[in-house]
Amino acid sequence: MQTEVSQFAAFIGIDWADRKHDVCLQVAGSDTRETSILEHRPAAIDAWAKALRHRFGGRPIAVCLELADGPIVSAILEHDFFTLFPVNPSTLAGYRKTFTPSGAKDDPTDAAIALELLRRHPEKLKPLHRENDDMRSLRRLVEARRDLVHDRVRVTNRLIFTLKSYFPQILDWFRDKETEVFAAFIERWPSLQDAQRARHDTIVAFFHAHNVRRASVVDRRAQAMKSEVPLTSDPAVIEPARHIVAALLPQLRALSAGIVSLDSEIAIRCRALPDYHLFAELPGAGEVFASRLLAAFGEQRDRFANAAAFQKYVGIAPVTERSGNKHWVHWRWACPRFLRQTFVEWVASSIPHSFWARAFYDSHKAKGASHNATIRALAFKWIRILFRCWIDRTPHNESRYLAALQKRHSPILKFAAQDPS
């Protein structure tokens, strides 16, 4: 615990839930523990906090719970005399097993265990420091954007599946199924028969109205519409499918509009943060990955002792286990999945845009490593580089890094020399 224990007037363990929170409180210098139940209502939490402020004269109070974000955390941090010490749920579960080997779980007991962990092992816990509003907003926005993208993929896949049952030709005419021109075309001509009844000039005017003006593309699509043969003329297939498509199109449009709106807000937040330039020019990052990487690193540079600690936190560093003569290495399961996904996705995107990343990838593939294993290894390498850039507040320089590899006679350069680009 980075904060001196002696400064706290009381210590609190909380086992949070959706509707109520179990609380276990111990006054500093006392062995007596007080248990209570706190309703999850803003007024109840506020009244509880004000009562504690009055009772202890506004002196600092330490609070331990297995959560670093969420409604209860936001409510607690509204009061400046609380110092929050979040603990990993797996850590608390392991500590619980020390006292209950049977695996029994009880909410009031969990609150007491959180308090016990706070009192007996303060050196294992770090206080939660609230980052500035823009950084905290950015972190929520980029994760929400990824969720909307996932939802859009799900809706698009359902739309494609439905179109394949009666109107598969349209899937060949439009490569990008998430565009407004694709949605507008289906809305106007929801079947091949409808499209074939349209005049050539009407088709051309439609594409021009949606900024598709290349004559070869428009003519090819218009001719294909007239020459294609319907997959089926069965109304029992076509009519239900048309209704399903009509139900999916508004969802697709709403999700696309939501993503555009979030992109605008994310851009505003990024421009307000001084570290954005460290990630904006990374190979293959673009605005989407740059904002996610910025949110992943945050602004608290004393939070991680070194790059290895950060690699473990985001789930890129593997886990090594030993038992007797056995030794095995496996994927790290307990980690923030979105952060790990951020690095895995960006690293894959960096390969076509980074000379050394391409060489690193090719060298590992030449050794027989799988694509996924190679991406994880490359992510491990990239994080070490980015961590140093983040600590030093210096953007990554590809030429400088290549010169460093050459100075160390890195074997990666052999593959870099063979790169056809």
Predicted regions and their residues:
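A detector of single, family-specific signature residues
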Residues: 1-421
